[in-house]
Amino acid sequence: MSKRSAAGSGSIRKRTFTRKGKEYTYWEARYSVGYDPGTGKQIQKTITGKTQKEVNQKLKAATVAIDEGTYIAPSKMTVGEWLDIWSEEYLGNVKPLTVSAYKTSIKNHLKPNLGAIKLEALNTHTIQGFYNALGEEKEDEEPLSAKTIKNIHGILHRALKQAVLNGYIRYNPTEACILPRIVKKDIMPLDEADTKLFLEAIKGDPFELLFTVTLFTGLRKGEVLGLTWNCVDFLRGTILVEKQLQQEKKKKGKYYLATLKNDKPRSVTPAPWVMQILRKQKLKQAEDRIAAGAAWSNPDNLVFTNPLGGHLVPWTVSRHYKEIVASIGRPDARFHDLRHSYAVAAIRSGDDIKTVQGNLGHATASFTLDVYGHVTDQMKNASAARMEAYIKDILSA
């Protein structure tokens, strides 16, 4: 009877191959990880490397892991593939709304940045770099808040915890990551005086109508740049916000129309004056189309375009905005503050928080109140002061 090889035993040999007439050399180790219980045949695995030393180190590590019972067979599964499996098969006890939020974060953040990495190769340093990058301000987009990054971390941590339980990876690399401290950022809206100066400064500017619509609708930059004419209903006086302009997560990535951050389209009813601004934009675009002639191309039917019908570049819009606000003494103002300006103006005009939440596309009214609660507090104080004056007037009569 032949003697069985012990699990973990292996041999190293030098291998060569020829490609395009040139000979290449590498080292290979084959080792046993045990026997198939069904067939009784030996299960063989292979390790390769550029040098004998590299392969020998890998073989020793695999042998130790086999002896200790911690060995995990190499897998070609990527992080993206595992996230898809996990989100479809391991969230049966999670509310549908939460599952939807998980899938949105996976699609918008985790897969574009980590999806192509082999699951077993994902490490703490890579994940930490990903978290840090999410919190950095870029020219064409706002940084994610510390709270949002923490939520994304929670999803990844949970998915990788299951991968450990399934035996796909030895440990959860998110465990050692350092999350940013959640600091509530002050909003910097344009006040009434700033708004008047801003509107005066953009008169005749190429982006005048774009800036004006953003200021008085509260649309995010990606939403206003991704707005299409089929979503503008002049008869009803409404705007359907269902898309946003995004760039592929790679160097010089192409721009495309994507679904919203929360995958929830919303209908906004702006002031009639804003709809008139959009009519002006339609006329301006028609003039641009005539001037461009055969060079015109607007396949997505975008509302705001360059002179040839193409999409506007987000960082160009932001840079030009910064030049405008600097000229009126507000160099600290960001493009996103146009959204804050709309929200504050709406609340002070008497809109309730629920209405403002719906127009802004926030997930909950509590989030809207958390961001703009100080405005309602100021209004309450002003109301109390008016009532105080009224009471004193009555008592002194």
Residue ranges and their predicted role:
Residues 231-238, 331-332, 351-373, 381:
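Short, polar N-cap/turn motifs at the start of nucleic acid-interacting alpha helices
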Residues 19-24, 72-76, 87-168, 184-186, ...:
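N-terminal core-binding DNA-recognition domain of tyrosine site-specific recombinases/integrases
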Residues 45, 52, 238-240, 258-280, ...:
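C-terminal catalytic core of Y-nucleophile DNA break-rejoin enzymes
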Residues 2, 200, 236, 247-249, ...:
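C-terminal secondary-structure termini that scaffold catalytic or DNA-interacting sites
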Residues 142-146, 150-152, 165, 169-229, ...:
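Basic, Lys/Arg- and aromatic-enriched nucleic-acid-binding interface segment
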Residues 1-77, 81-89, 103-104, 129-132, ...:
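Basic/aromatic DNA-contact patch characteristic of tyrosine site-specific recombinases
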Residues 138-142, 200-207, 217, 268, ...:
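Short, basic (Lys/Arg/His-rich) helix/loop patches that form interaction surfaces
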Residues 181, 185, 189, 245, ...:
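Catalytic-site neighborhood detector that most strongly recognizes the C-terminal catalytic loop/helix
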